Amino acid sequence: MKKILLAFAMLVSLTMIKAQPVHTLDLSGTWKVTWNEGGHGPQSLDDYLHTDPFQDPARFMEVPVPMELHLALQKAGLVEDINYGMNTLKARWVAEKYWLYAKTFSVPEEALKEKAWLVFDQLDLNAVIMLNGETVGTHSSAFVPCRIEVTGKLQAGENLLQIGIESGLYGVADKDGGSYLQNMGALLNKRHWMRKPQYQFLWDWNPQLINVGITGAVRLEWTESLRLDQVVVQCHLSDDLQKAMLTVKSFLEGWEQESLKIKTSVLETGQNTLTDIQIKPGLNPYTSKVEIWEPKLWWPAGQGEQPLYHVKVELLDGQTVLAEKNIRTGIRRIQIDQSSHPVVGNYFTIIVNNRKVFMKGGNWVPPEMIYSNVSRERLDALTDMAIKANFNMLRIWGGAIWAGHDLLDLCDEKGLLVWHDLLFACSKYPGDDKEFYDMVKHEVTWGVREFSPHPSLAVWCGNNENEVGTWSWGWDRFGKIMPDYGLYHLLIPVIMKEEDPSRPYWPSSPFSTEFTDPASPVTGDQHPWDVSLGAAGPDFWAYRNYVDRFPNEGGVMGASSPATIRQFLPPDEQYMRSFSWDHHDNEVNFWNYKPGIDYQFVEFWLGKSAEDLGFEKYLLASALIQAEGLNEYISNYRRRMFSTSSAIFWMYNDSWPATHGWTIVDYYLRKKLAYHPVRRAFQPVTTVLAMEHDTVKVFGVNDSPVDWQGTLRYGIFRLSGRYNVDERLPIVIPANASAVLASISAVQWNNRKATGAFGILEKDGKQVAQYRLFTERFKDMSFSKPVVKITRGKGTVTLESDVFVWGACIDVDGEKEVPDNCFDLLPGIPYTIPWTDKEMPKIEFTGNGLF
């Protein structure tokens, strides 16, 4: 009987326990740090990690946390500005040391009695966590937070927290390199084993700078009973778009049975649901649902508005709020149409809210070499410039880091859809290793849950170019054959189905269905690199015949602006091919022992070498050629909509100041000469001219959701002035379509070295878009010195030239807030741009001046 009463008393006691909220103690701030490599301290790693920082305090320096160590040492004057000159080479020692952090702290008395964790939002990379001399945990991924339970390990008074951390080089020292990658750098650093941003190990556009340190916030958490972890929001929109079901999964960690409620509210509609839940021991999901009728739909830029809903999740014990999270989301439906193409292969078209949308944009890389140092302001500026360039999509490339909430929030607000590669790029990965496999499983599960609420996040993709590497790059001829196939085709699809069935998953980029070549142009997505990196080389007119279904990586390089070049080159190295010039240059220029592809581009199109042109003219010539190439890339694909359904180029932004680069916005956020030509090529309504057989076809392209009416002016112009053909006709371009508006017989186009074809769209007497087509290279054409008249109107200026002007630039350094730049002037045809500055614009450079 006593046993029964005791058991009953225990049961009553358990049911009387009330859940308590989670308490936190911020442990960020000032820490102490020292370094060792087996000489500057104990040779034994274990002895080193248990170094008492108070025995020799002079060995330690103070650093802020969170902060990557290159940056912390730069602020302390021990490392020079990594963006300048040769300084990344001077800073490599930082990644080669084993670092030891230390911090003391005291805790409230209740923290000693309750469940407690040390939480690190990010550690890069391999970390050993020690509390009061005891190793309490390890961590080896920069892609997921670190949470270490320390219940019963805290002490009254002062606690000593020590973190031993290294960049990853020590951890892979005895691992297999050659079975996965055989380039020189990978044999040395074995990056494929490390779960951290891969671009740190050197890419063609970025030097090696292997990050290391405590790069995320640090805190102590404690609670008596349970804690709220991640909250997942999934949107399911009915076929008729009239009803949205928000499924909210709250992940709660508990240790005993108890009854609670979850209140889920949508603030904009006033709706809420109250869901009874039974807490079970462990980390488990608890689901609630909210139905919204006639929801306001979220659209990508150019297709509609971006209304956002605020969802509040509260964990209740009676009337007491134990925990809450406020989450912002949007309601939209994403599908990919892969139906059969009437000619060959399949379509690959992203459909948003039952409407086909042509994807326009660029590839995104971390905008700093030290990726944890990217500010919200920098992200805001870059996304603003993307929107102004008429983007509606960014592709987050797989060699980087999670987009993160700050970037995705901005994309949500501005209407930028996101194609997000998972974090694998250009390598075989050890998916056959259980520890690596388990880490990937944890990492992908965490990321898919964490970023689920963002309406901008449209597509998850398994990796960047790992499939095509085996198919086309000879990866099947060495080492392990597709050791990571199971990750992208088995493990991750299961995770996606369980965690986020609301978004499409694509196994690799590029990838094609039906077990065909991953780079097939007629199915799946494509990386059309034959221009720049393949057989076509510098001839970007090859783009004119490309029929790719969904090109999302391909591009043309160009030099950064003179102002940027001078900012990162030391005064005594401000000349072409100086040591710092080459160090900051794209690696592609050194793949062969001959002048690199950038120099070949200029010589191919202009017939002049870099030496012929000289420092300043060469930089502008290279930038102008990039503008031409990207215009060809974009215009070819846009005229083919929706046989082709995207024009996404490589790449949008830079991680450091580059001599030549793929980007249209450089590291210092200066607009390169290609920026405005890309903006015009992406504008919602435009015209494109293309030669097909013996006919010049004039296309009207309209990716807006309404028909466009106006006037088309088209014909053949002479570079020296006058028009051989000059026609006008009223036109209608259907909504969300490309259509042939007119044509010119090739018979009418004579003496092509002195003439070009043109098209202009006008509405209400104002020019909306213009396009010109040449079939002879610039070096073979007859350019004249122009006389340009500039006149002021009401809030505008108008430029008019007596002869054709190629690439008139009013801001060669990309530093001014000009509404347009690097535009052609057709002979005798006014070109008007908005202008409110008191000072009139001046033409600083034209392509004509290169001859």
Model-derived features: positions:
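Active-site rim elements
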Residues: 91, 202-206, 479-483, 616-621
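Soluble or luminal CAZymes and related metallo-dependent hydrolases
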Residues: 97, 378, 439-443, 483-488, ...
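Secreted/periplasmic carbohydrate-active enzymes, especially glycoside hydrolases
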Residues: 1-10, 17-393, 639-640, 670, ...
